Amino acid sequence: MENLGDLAQGLALLGKYLGAGLCMGIGAIGPGIGEGNIGAHAMDAMARQPEMVGTITTRMLLADAVAETTGIYSLLIAFMILLVV
């Protein structure tokens, strides 16, 4: 009977770690794709209008920060899964 309790505790830990890993892994896909698109379009815009490099860079960094928020939220949720559950 004692082994059954250890098995249940081990499965609970497995679920917790697997859930946090999936949360972070899947939650990082969107920001990665979004930031890549932002960077690609910013480079295209800088190649077309070299005189606007400063403005384009500023807006690119701001858009990257906004795109990264979902990754940060998934990191916070992963930490909550690890520490609270």
UniProtKB/Swiss-Prot annotation:
Record GO biological process: proton motive force-driven ATP synthesis
Lineage: Bacteria, Thermotogati, Thermotogota, Thermotogae, Thermotogales
Species of provenance: Thermotoga maritima (strain ATCC 43589 / DSM 3109 / JCM 10099 / NBRC 100826 / MSB8)
Gene3D superfamilies: F1F0 ATP synthase subunit C
Family assignment from sequence similarity: Belongs to the ATPase C chain family.
GO cellular component, one term: plasma membrane
Protein name as catalogued: ATP synthase subunit c
Topology versus the membrane: Multi-pass membrane protein
Site (Reversibly protonated during proton transport): E68
A Pfam family annotated for this UniProt entry: ATP-synt_C
Annotated compartments: Cell inner membrane
Coiled-coil intervals, chain numbering: none
Superkingdom classification of source: Bacteria
Spans through the membrane: 10-30, 65-85
Keywords: ATP synthesis, Cell inner membrane, Cell membrane, CF(0), Hydrogen ion transport, Ion transport, Lipid-binding, Membrane, Transmembrane, Transmembrane helix, Transport
Function: F(1)F(0) ATP synthase produces ATP from ADP in the presence of a proton or sodium gradient. F-type ATPases consist of two structural domains, F(1) containing the extramembraneous catalytic core and F(0) containing the membrane proton channel, linked together by a central stalk and a peripheral stalk. During catalysis, ATP synthesis in the catalytic domain of F(1) is coupled via a rotary mechanism of the central stalk subunits to proton translocation. Key component of the F(0) channel; it plays a direct role in translocation across the membrane. A homomeric c-ring of between 10-14 subunits forms the central stalk rotor element with the F(1) delta and epsilon subunits.
Assembly and binders: F-type ATPases have 2 components, F(1) - the catalytic core - and F(0) - the membrane proton channel. F(1) has five subunits: alpha(3), beta(3), gamma(1), delta(1), epsilon(1). F(0) has three main subunits: a(1), b(2) and c(10-14). The alpha and beta chains form an alternating ring which encloses part of the gamma chain. F(1) is attached to F(0) by a central stalk formed by the gamma and epsilon chains, while a peripheral stalk is formed by the delta and b chains.
GO molecular function: lipid binding; proton-transporting ATP synthase activity, rotational mechanism
Keyword hit for Protein biosynthesis: no
